[in-house]
């Protein structure tokens, strides 16, 4: 019987660094785990092509889903295209350990269907300003892990990491969050530890 593959949803607004995170996760984990990726773009397969061109994973381990119209629907109300892509990846590669499912660029109110994602990671970035965490929305408050990316630009945009830290704690309670910079891999080890622990991959 085919084992149930761990599905990790990665969401967040356009430009927050979702694809850069996926690339770093692939480069760091591909030799340790049997993994694959599904990306969602509205009219193109741009993110899937980026990962392939940047040698993140072999091309047959990446499927780009063209959602058309509203990208929220493909990860929430009708996840059938994404579920079919996961089935296809499982058919290609026996005993996958996990699949990363990247949502199309979405807003703070988008969430993954429980049937599509066992663990949800939500990525926001500092360049949008330090008010983003307190705006709330399911991505900020309910994701299993919140990543606050691009901390290197905080001074450039006048954002306070201290304010973001305090607001995020207020909005998330005990739920974890990590400050990161994918260019320098800052925070990456903590993100990987979270995935391994919560996904029970290291057992």
Curated annotation (Swiss-Prot):
Quote a single Gene Ontology cellular component term: cytoplasm
Entry annotated with the keyword Zinc-finger = no
Binding positions for GTP?
Answer: 12-19
Please give the biological process terms from Gene Ontology that the record holds: urea catabolic process
Supply one GO molecular-function term: GTP binding
Q: Where in the cell is it found?
A: Cytoplasm
Q: Which InterPro entries match?
A: CobW/HypB/UreG_nucleotide-bd, P-loop_NTPase, UreG
Location (main, coarse): cytoplasm
Decide whether keyword Chaperone is in the record.
yes
UniProt keyword terms in alphabetical order: Chaperone, Cytoplasm, GTP-binding, Nickel insertion, Nucleotide-binding
Q: Which family does it belong to?
A: Belongs to the SIMIBI class G3E GTPase family. UreG subfamily.
Task: State the protein's purpose.
Answer: Facilitates the functional incorporation of the urease nickel metallocenter. This process requires GTP hydrolysis, probably effectuated by UreG.
What quaternary structure, including any partners, is listed in this protein's UniProt entry?
Homodimer. UreD, UreF and UreG form a complex that acts as a GTP-hydrolysis-dependent molecular chaperone, activating the urease apoprotein by helping to assemble the nickel containing metallocenter of UreC. The UreE protein probably delivers the nickel.
Q: What is this protein called?
A: Urease accessory protein UreG
> Gene of origin?
ureG
């Amino acid at each position: 019987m085919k084992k149930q593959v761990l599905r990790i949803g990665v969401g967040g607004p356009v430009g927050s660094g979702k694809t850069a995170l996926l690339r770093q996760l692939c480069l760091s984990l591909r030799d340790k785990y049997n993994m694959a990726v599904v990306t969602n773009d509205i009219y193109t397969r741009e993110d899937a092509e980026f990962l392939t061109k940047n040698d993140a994973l072999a091309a047959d381990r990446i499927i780009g889903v063209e959602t058309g119209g509203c990208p929220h629907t493909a990860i929430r109300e009708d996840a059938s295209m994404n579920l079919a892509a996961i089935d296809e990846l499982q058919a290609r590669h026996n005993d996958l350990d996990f699949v990363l499912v990247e949502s199309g660029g979405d807003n703070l109110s988008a969430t993954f269907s429980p049937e599509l994602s066992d663990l949800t990671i939500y990525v926001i970035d500092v360049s949008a300003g330090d008010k983003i965490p307190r705006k709330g929305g399911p991505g900020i408050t309910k994701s299993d892990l919140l990543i606050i990316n691009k901390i290197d630009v905080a001074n450039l945009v006048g954002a306070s990491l201290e304010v973001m830290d305090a607001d995020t704690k207020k909005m998330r309670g005990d739920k974890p969050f990590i400050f990161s910079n994918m260019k320098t891999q800052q925070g990456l080890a903590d993100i990987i530890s979270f995935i391994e622990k919560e996904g029970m991959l290291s057992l």
